[in-house]
Amino acid sequence: MKLITILFLCSRLLLSLTQESQSEEIDCNDKDLFKAVDAALKKYNSQNQSNNQFVLYRITEATKTVGSDTFYSFKYEIKEGDCPVQSGKTWQDCEYKDAAKAATGECTATVGKRSSTKFSVATQTCQITPAEGPVVTAQYDCLGCVHPISTQSPDLEPILRHGIQYFNNNTQHSSLFMLNEVKRAQRQVVAGLNFRITYSIVQTNCSKENFLFLTPDCKSLWNGDTGECTDNAYIDIQLRIASFSQNCDIYPGKDFVQPPTKICVGCPRDIPTNSPELEETLTHTITKLNAENNATFYFKIDNVKKARVQVVAGKKYFIDFVARETTCSKESNEELTESCETKKLGQSLDCNAEVYVVPWEKKIYPTVNCQPLGMISLMKRPPGFSPFRSSRIGEIKEETTVSPPHTSMAPAQDEERDSGKEQGHTRRHDWGHEKQRKHNLGHGHKHERDQGHGHQRGHGLGHGHEQQHGLGHGHKFKLDDDLEHQGGHVLDHGHKHKHGHGHGKHKNKGKKNGKHNGWKTEHLASSSEDSTTPSAQTQEKTEGPTPIPSLAKPGVTVTFSDFQDSDLIATMMPPISPAPIQSDDDWIPDIQIDPNGLSFNPISDFPDTTSPKCPGRPWKSVSEINPTTQMKESYYFDLTDGLS
């Protein structure tokens, strides 16, 4: 029975030792965190007995540790306020001092929460950047007057050293004190020099019983007593301290709690990736990897990404590393040596290993798992093809053929517009089958009658699609009710731009015409049978380039609701003359653009609106900015600007 009781007590003790405090990042605007910062800032201001109070600017980092007690570890920025310490006001009642005259700082603190309203400062360190302060000049007009000097002046060192020694020898305090910060210094030229120096001191861990004077082993105590001293010293012409007086005020340290300690027996802990204890472990790991790998060449550890160790019945290492293929083959080398260099274009492996080490048996048991990262290779690009362009070869169906290299590609308008936005209605008659038909030869005639009110009539071949021609004869006739033949450009929402001269015009249908749906363009092609139509080709060669049509047709009103971005782009595009039959880039195939590729994926102008937890909101604005006066004039581009 006693044995069972002892085992139960031991298990409970081990369980209590293995409990680890849970730490988590919290919002910098948390209410309890603000109370902890308030306690830390009041603690700091209470130790400053002569200057102005510091006011919170904002909290930059915050972590909450929950265990037997709750602790807040945080960083916060402060600015000097306009309230003196002796004013009796809290820092919340103070305003920021002028930026040119105010000191700033950053503090790191750990505060324990004892109850819902009680917060105790465990540790705190503040780095204060003083303001410019009074101007220090090399010469004054007033001879013999008291003038401020820099607190970093080397002339102050012997006086400060003497002052600290004088304080430690003439006080009843059990510990030695050391210099903390020089706050102000003044000097007066007489028959020698008069100095008046104000500085702060702090208690150290060196007691007077064990140390007669300060040594490098003496360190300041955060929970120790602090003080502020003002020394008056006279240095004669022999640079000796002829007279010295000192006035010091001591402020006892209070309300100190020890920071939380984390005890986790057997928990994994991180170790440096270049730790010497990993050398033997990594050697056995790469040996195990090469023994299990069937590759022709040896692999070598390129870099260690992360390493952890856990104390068990021995030690267990968890290592993440990258292995690279070397130039040493397994056939010509019995083992991996230091002279084996990694291949520049070799294969890489992303590996994680668990290595169990039993020191008293001098045994190591490694287990390695690797995933290939791929092989580095060089790819040839066609000349002029941008490396940043994302593309893929279009899928070739039975009904389509690859376009010849000399065929140029012209953009096509989208014919599937919303008919509700037009002034009139659009009628379309189609004959054919369900699939789109593509012809290498044939005569496709498109007849359109503009009635002046947006009524449009189109005849084509194919079910829902216009007939596509390679190098056939494409005749387009444009007839007005007034029988007036105009080479114009009708801007009507829902139909394509028509370029015409007089009664009709033979156009090269070998240019890729497609239906523009989103960003997808269907490529059509010509057949080798186009040699059977010499008359059409001869007529096309003798015809001059098509002139750029005017933007607006006389007598036709253009409404902005019918105006599209593509209308402006297509209108301003110059005519594309037929490319030469033979070209140096004939071997470059037509590449279908990936609509989801990088070149067509617009990058967002603004980041995501998810607001981070830290840093928090400023306590008070340093300077109020009027958004109505600070906003710059923005220029909004309207497509109507293209009409002017």
Curated annotation (Swiss-Prot):
Disulfide cysteine pairs (residue numbers): C28-C614, C83-C94, C107-C126, C142-C145, C206-C218, C229-C248, C264-C267, C328-C340, C351-C370
Composition-biased stretches (Polar residues): 524-539
Pfam families the record matches: Cystatin
Disordered: annotated segments: 387-555
GO molecular function: cysteine-type endopeptidase inhibitor activity; heparin binding; hormone activity; signaling receptor binding; zinc ion binding
N-terminal signal peptide: 1-18
GO BP field: blood coagulation; inflammatory response; negative regulation of blood coagulation; negative regulation of cell adhesion; negative regulation of proteolysis; positive regulation of apoptotic process; positive regulation of cytosolic calcium ion concentration; vasodilation
Function: Kininogens are inhibitors of thiol proteases. HMW-kininogen plays an important role in blood coagulation by helping to position optimally prekallikrein and factor XI next to factor XII; HMW-kininogen inhibits the thrombin- and plasmin-induced aggregation of thrombocytes. LMW-kininogen inhibits the aggregation of thrombocytes. LMW-kininogen is in contrast to HMW-kininogen not involved in blood clotting.
PANTHER family, sorted: FETUIN, KININOGEN-1
Listed name of the protein: Kininogen-1
